[in-house]
Amino acid sequence: ILSRAYSSYRTRTPAPVGVFGPGWKAPFDIRLQIRDEGLILNDSGGRSIHFEPLFPGEISYSRSESLWLARGGVAAQHSSQPLSALWQVLPEDVRLSPHVYLATNSLQGPWWILSWPERVPGADEVLPPEPPAYRVLTGVVDGFGRTLTFHRAAEGDVAGAVTGVTDGAGRCFHLVLTTQAQRAEAFRKQRATSLSSPAGPRSASSSSAFPDTLPAGTEYGADNGIRLEAVWLTHDPAYPDEQPTAPLARYTYTASGELRAVYDRSGTQVR
């Protein structure tokens, strides 16, 4: 949940910028692009892995990347399929849905479940809405059937982004997200407070020092400006009556949306 990786590699078919900013990827930043000419899997390492279109129940293997991509739609795989045993650990509704895609890099798992997040449809939208031309990570299932579930916002400024995670042990985590406009407003308030202090600086920087918006497109992909600010443990079945008083991790960003610093639960800067 808290891990992240950096890659300066720029693919020609990138996924959108993730919640840690340009170049950084979280495990849940995996994304599948569904195009007429094929499928493009953007992994958490920044790569774009291309596959041919899949029929329901079909599995394709990329030898160059040692990765399988599958499409749901069948209850079971043929016994000659190397992934037939691993297929059976998936929930039945996942196996049977032709709208769900799955990826794995090992015959022992885990499976990455690629589906679309729930959202609140528009007032004039025809129901049910058509599946989008992409899939995002909604869960991870290990070889024993234990599931890590990602909860995404259905509406609002951060619609579609991961705001909660439930692990196989039943622990629940809340991800606090901010928009560029919210960070800019917080910067201005902090600046105003420091200027009003006797010990504060005497000159204020212009409002352009922290813009309300970021450029929509970058070399790393489209950027909506949403960033991860903090991760909280909100429920632990082993300690149901205990509530943490500090986040597990906290993150700060520059005015241009780049990751500046990372703090652990003790408040110590670790990056």
Feature map (PLM): residue ranges:
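Surface-exposed recognition patches
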Residues: I1-R271
